[in-house]
Curated annotation (Swiss-Prot):
It catalyses: tRNA(Met) + L-methionine + ATP = L-methionyl-tRNA(Met) + AMP + diphosphate. The gene is MSM1. PROSITE patterns: AA_TRNA_LIGASE_I (PS00178). Catalyzes the attachment of methionine to tRNA(Met) in the mitochondrion. This is Methionine--tRNA ligase, mitochondrial.
Length: 575
């Protein structure tokens, strides 16, 4: 009992955050990136605090959708098709600094073993049986829809659509294995009621609860497909005539990536690799201590279109297998483009890699995190992305550039004021209460910032967090602009420069989870040493050694102005 208590204390700070695994049947898009960014910031922040954190992403490579896409693209084997496409998702993650600990593919051998194990446990515990399935199936969604959610296609006579995704459905009758989902209604509802943060935000939790409590008993779920129809999938254990349903397969990745079901059940330490194909590389290996605790502290970050699979099916599979439930499922909206759904036919699909190459990956990271709410769909507007970059240049970049001018001496200011007790500066501006008040307020905001970051990141409220960052940057710029340090005697000048540079230093340290590359450039520009970029130095006056060469002429600015991409393209076309 004492041992269990020690384990709980040791790993109460462990976290495992996941994105959905993505279909590699087309190029990665903004929605893929957004899920990854939400997860990446959370993961980076946990590491920044010194906590143990794991982060899983990857590709969902089985199923009829992949099989059909492979055939239509002229591949004789689906594996060759996904082998060609999955690197594009790895590339997206690399460009945007997505710091995952495991990129899992559902074709990885260790994952296939875990799918088999999950099936065997559910079967052994009496939750899987063979039956006949009749219903409306969507290839695009890889799921069946009830009659109540099927309508005639108004544009194509003889075809039918489902009312949820608006994708085509076809009527099928076949023999499948079924999962006894009907036994889990009350268990799932009870768990959500006892753990109100299990589904977040609250609006999505309430929606799921309403569906579970008013929709009647859940129908049992078909969890296999005939091998004659679905050739590309994991065979069901001991029955090659059936393939495992793609969602039963895909959801299991969250267990495979933290050591697998046997390790979770025994809570035994396991070694996993960042990429299974590179498992012999010791540098890419990661130790997963106490996998059961890691599973209990898992947060799934998902899009609203797959909420049912994660909030109803997945907990039911885990309960049936005797495995711990995750801590939380965070559901976010989708991304539009200029108020319209993105589609190839409209020609408005945003390529996140193109955006990163022109504007910079960290600019796109900031823009997406600032202009989104979990409860709503985001609206991508390239003009607004450009405006975000301009603001970072003119406000944060310019704050650094002005204070690094030859008229000032950052090193002297830091040495003079970093030791001031409680940072009470009123005596320096005795006859200027407005300046004194601005300095005091800025100092308080900076010392409070670490707590604000912790609070907002814990609940994925990134827009609120970035508003806090902007308010501090604006206050620092106002202080410099209105107090005119270039016209003052040295003590007053150094006091103002110290506060302005502490603003940039502290925010750059804290924003490493949000803009990992740009924050390093800002810190490099004011000569903050690499070892002093940790959470221990994100307090006023905690670094007394930076700024030594910052006021030398000829230093490169960390962020420069660029023209609007579409405007530059038009100019190039005319020339």
């Amino acid at each position: 009992m004492q041992c269990r208590s020690i384990v709980h204390r040791l790993y109460s700070k462990v976290s495992h955050v996941t994105t959905p695994i993505f279909y590699p049947n087309a190029k990665p898009h903004l929605g893929h990136l957004y899920s990854s960014l939400l997860s990446d910031v959370y993961h980076r922040w946990q590491l920044f605090k010194g906590n143990l954190s794991f982060f899983t992403t990857g590709t969902d490579e089985h199923g009829l959708k992949i099989q059909c896409a492979s055939e239509s693209n002229g591949f004789d084997q689906p594996k060759k098709f996904v082998d060609k496409l999955y690197p594009e998702f790895v590339q997206l993650d690399k460009i945007y600094g997505i710091n995952y600990t495991r990129f899992i593919r559902t074709t990885d051998p260790d994952h296939i073993e875990n799918v088999m194990k999950l099936w065997e446990l559910c079967l052994k515990n009496g939750y899987i049986y063979m039956g006949e399935h009749k219903g409306w199936y969507s290839i695009s969604d890889e799921t069946f829809y009830p009659e109540s959610k099927v309508i005639k296609d108004p544009k194509n006579d003889g075809k039918y659509l489902n009312t949820e995704s608006k994708n085509e459905v076809v009527y099928q009758s076949e023999t499948n294995y079924f999962f006894r989902l009907s036994l889990f209604n009350k268990k799932i509802v009870d768990h959500i009621r006892k753990n109100p943060d299990f589904i977040f935000p609250a609006s999505k939790r309430d929606q799921i609860l309403k569906e579970l409590e008013t929709g009647g008993t859940l129908p049992d779920l078909s969890i296999s497909r005939p091998s004659a129809r679905l050739k590309w999938g994991i065979p069901t254990p001991n029955d090659p005539s059936q393939k495992v349903y793609v969602w039963f397969d895909a959801l299991c990745n969250y267990l495979s990536s933290i050591g697998g079901i046997p390790s979770i059940l025994s809570n035994a330490t396991e070694v996993v690799s960042r990429h299974y194909s590179d498992k012999s590389n010791v540098k890419g290996q990661l130790l997963i201590p106490y996998p059961k605790e890691v599973q209990r502290n898992t947060i799934h970050v998902i899009g609203k279109d797959i909420a049912k699979f994660h909030t109803v099916y997945w907990p039911s599979f885990l309960l049936a297998a005797g495995l711990p439930l995750p801590r939380q499922i965070v559901v976010h909206g989708h991304w539009l483009c200029n108020g319209m759904k993105m589609s190839k036919s409209l020609g408005n699909v945003v390529d996140p890699i193109d955006m990163a190459r022109y504007y910079g990956a960290d600019i796109v990271r900031w823009f997406l995190l600032e202009n989104s709410k979990l409860e709503e769909d985001g609206d991508f507007q390239e003009a607004k992305l450009y405006e975000t970059r301009e603001l970072l240049v003119s406000k944060w970049g310019n704050l650094i550039n002005r204070c690094c001018g030859s008229k000032f001496n950052i090193e002297r200011a830091v040495m003079k004021f970093s030791d001031k007790a409680n940072f009470q500066f009123q005596e320096i501006f005795q006859n200027e209460p407005i300046v004194s008040e601005r300095i005091e307020n800025l100092a308080k905001l900076l010392n409070k910032s670490q707590e604000v970051f912790d609070e907002k990141i814990a609940i994925f409220q990134y827009p609120q967090l970035l508003r806090h960052v902007w308010s501090i940057i604006n206050d620092a710029n106002t202080l410099v602009q209105n107090s005119k340090p270039w016209e003052r005697e040295l003590d007053q000048q150094d006091n103002i420069i110290f506060l302005a540079m502490e603003t940039s230093r502290i925010l750059s340290i804290l924003c490493q989870s949000i803009i990992p590359s740009l924050s390093q450039s800002f810190l490099d520009r004011i000569d903050v040493s690499k070892e002093k970029r940790t959470i221990n130095y994100a307090r006023l006056g905690s670094d007394k050694t930076y700024g030594k060469q910052s006021n030398k002429k000829g230093r490169e600015v960390p962020l420069k102005k660029i023209p609007f991409r579409l405007q530059e393209e038009q100019t190039n076309m005319r020339s």
